[in-house]
């Protein structure tokens, strides 16, 4: 049985001072990759999720190199790259814009193709060299990770395939305030299945839908359910109590934004914002919750870093993201 704790971590992370003009107004802590990964234009970080004591970050290659996962220990400030493979052992060529960890299962977004499921037991250690690689760049890769299965759930009643641009796993029994309004009877809070949240990146008239899918033991349970439309340029989604929190990017030189929708738990006071209290976001003061289909209004501008991507929460409920642009890349913990 493999474990992420068994993966050797030969590369070094570095703590960064928080620079809010780069890292966003909600930034609390920041870490940087090593110099090569900070500046490479071949590999671009995208998805993020916590897997117990390890942080996982996905990258895709702009030079047909496939995709990879960085296994990160932020306490020791070290990490390793683990190339992703198809079930046949070929490089997994996906954008990997979102990740979600589900008790040994890893879900990897594959845009129009759906999403892949991987399991930690399938990690294959490579004695320091990645399979099918002879380049110096990947000689320190200690393992490869083959995918098990591709899933492509569709939205009932929609002719347009859902694009799995990003994702995150919600807590057991989570539902949005709008879903609760539509339900009658007693709420169930069973620990399984888990809600998988997902959304579409879109600009220029492309759809920007948000959806949820129940997952159990790495398998979809039931249909994909629509949660409404989000703003253009979405890069990540996670929960905020009974609400949804999404990130949007603004190019390689401007900070991104966060958008909130949901119930009364989204209301904050001026004091919370002024003091920068943990669990708050800049510019949220006085804003009431909104249903998911009104997410496009009321952004909390410049709260997210330049090149903001996927969102996730750790076991303590803290908010995390990653920035993608060379020279400004960082793993970030945000207020929220």
Short names for language-model regions:
Residues 44, 51-96:
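Short N-terminal edge-element motif at the start of the domain
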Residues 61-62, 105, 112, 121, ...:
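Residue-level signature of beta-propeller blades and closely related beta-rich strand-turn architectures
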Residues 1-67, 307:
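Beta-strand-rich domains and repeat architectures in extracellular enzymes and scaffolds
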Residues 11-39, 78-91, 129-166, 222-230, ...:
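Surface-exposed loop and turn segments in beta-propeller and other repeat-based domains
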Residues 50-55, 194-206, 221-291, 301:
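Loop/turn-rich, solvent-exposed surfaces of beta-rich toroidal or solenoidal domains
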């Amino acid at each position: 049985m493999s474990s992420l704790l068994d993966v050797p971590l030969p590369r070094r992370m570095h703590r960064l001072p928080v620079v809010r003009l780069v890292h966003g107004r909600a930034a609390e802590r920041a870490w940087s990759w090593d110099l090569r990964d900070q500046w490479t234009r071949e590999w671009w970080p995208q998805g993020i999720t916590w897997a117990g004591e390890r942080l996982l970050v996905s990258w895709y290659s702009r030079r047909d190199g496939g995709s990879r996962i960085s296994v990160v220990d932020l306490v020791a400030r070290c990490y390793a790259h683990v190339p992703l493979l198809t079930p046949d052992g070929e490089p997994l060529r996906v954008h990997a814009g979102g990740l979600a960890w589900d008790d040994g299962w890893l879900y990897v977004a594959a845009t129009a193709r759906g999403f892949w499921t991987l399991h930690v037991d399938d990690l294959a250690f490579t004695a320091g060299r990645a399979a099918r690689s002879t380049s110096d760049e990947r000689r320190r890769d200690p393992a490869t990770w083959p995918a098990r299965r591709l899933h492509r759930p569709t939205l009932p009643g929609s002719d347009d395939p859902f694009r799995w641009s990003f994702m995150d796993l919600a807590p057991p029994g989570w539902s949005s305030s709008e879903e609760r309004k539509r339900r009658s009877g007693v709420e169930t809070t069973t620990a399984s299945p888990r809600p998988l949240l997902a959304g579409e990146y879109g600009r220029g008239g492309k759809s920007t839908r948000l959806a949820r899918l129940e997952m159990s033991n790495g398998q979809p349970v039931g249909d994909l359910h629509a949660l409404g439309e989000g703003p253009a340029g979405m890069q990540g989604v996670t929960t905020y109590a009974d609400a949804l929190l999404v990130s949007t990017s603004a190019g390689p030189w401007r900070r991104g934004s966060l958008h909130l929708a949901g119930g009364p738990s989204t209301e904050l006071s001026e004091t919370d914002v002024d003091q920068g209290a943990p669990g708050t976001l800049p510019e949220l003061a006085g804003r009431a919750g909104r249903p998911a289909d009104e997410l496009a209004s009321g952004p909390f501008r410049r709260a997210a870093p330049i090149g903001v991507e996927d969102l996730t929460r750790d076991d303590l409920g803290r908010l995390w993201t990653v920035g993608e642009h060379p020279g400004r890349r960082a793993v970030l913990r945000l207020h929220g």
